[in-house]
From Swiss-Prot:
Protein name: Peptidase E
Gene that produces this protein: pepE
Cellular component GO terms held in the UniProt record: cytoplasm
Pfam families per record: Peptidase_S51
Keyword terms of this UniProt record: Cytoplasm, Dipeptidase, Hydrolase, Protease, Serine protease
Organism, scientific name: Haemophilus influenzae (strain ATCC 51907 / DSM 11121 / KW20 / Rd)
The family this protein is said to belong to: Belongs to the peptidase S51 family.
Disulfide bond entries: none
The EC number(s) this enzyme carries: 3.4.13.21
Keyword Transcription regulation tagged: no
Length: 218
């Protein structure tokens, strides 16, 4: 019953904002044209909620859907309750999760998605759909009450996955950082999503979308 599209990033190579995702989203939301998307802008640290909402509305105008940010509601959960689809944008995962807790959205999002409401998210919005945010790439610039995330997907997500070390970088590679996580959490699975890829989860099955496959690390 669950139907989710977890996108690694909002851009791929030289494409515009969310441009590479449009064909995927058109297919994913084919039965929802004219319906309402509740958009969660909490991860967007460097822009206002109004600005983030407008950016996403413009980028996804070809979907023919009404995109409304949760901050438009008297209570943010009001917009979630009324929506046909839920979307969470990218940015800082710690800020995102903190505000999901502050506005009491964890349970209502989980309930709606478990009952069949389509969910899509990119970057932080993909990361927070997993079991916890412990495999985010972001700096902990604020502290949520828990690292436990929406748990719509029972495993870990690592968006923006890059294999190997960049030239001149002497710190740990992404594989090494994720290997550290798995040493401390040996029963976990990490789904690493390279740029330009997505994971479609439907009826308990996960399918790759995009030119690059995801990696499952354990």
């Amino acid at each position: 019953m669950k139907n989710m599209l977890l996108l690694s990033s909002s851009k791929y190579k030289n494409t515009g904002y969310l441009e590479h995702t449009i064909p995927w989203l058109q297919n994913f939301l084919a039965d929802y044209r004219g319906k309402t998307i509740a958009f969660v802008p909490y991860a967007g640290v460097s822009r206002t909620f109004d600005e983030y909402e407008k950016t996403v509305q413009n980028a996804l105008s070809d979907l023919g859907m009404n995109i409304v940010s949760v901050h438009r509601g008297k209570q943010h959960r009001d917009i979630i309750e009324q929506a046909d689809v839920i979307a969470i944008g990218g940015g800082n995962t710690f800020c995102l999760l903190k505000q999901l807790y502050e506005h009491n959205l964890i349970d209502i999002i989980r309930e709606k998605v478990n009952n069949g409401t389509p969910y899509f998210g990119w970057s932080a919005g993909a990361n927070v759909a997993g079991s916890s945010i412990m495999t985010t790439n972001d700096m902990p610039i604020t502290y949520p009450p828990s690292f436990q995330a929406l748990q719509l997907f029972p495993h870990q997500i690592n968006p923006h996955f890059i294999s190997g070390k960049m030239q001149g970088h002497n710190g740990e590679s992404r594989e090494e950082r994720l290997a550290e996580f798995l040493l401390v959490n040996p029963t976990a699975l990490v789904y690493a999503l390279p740029e330009g890829s997505a994971l479609h989860i439907q009826n308990g099955m996960g399918n790759r979308i995009g030119r690059k496959s995801y990696f499952v690390l354990q």
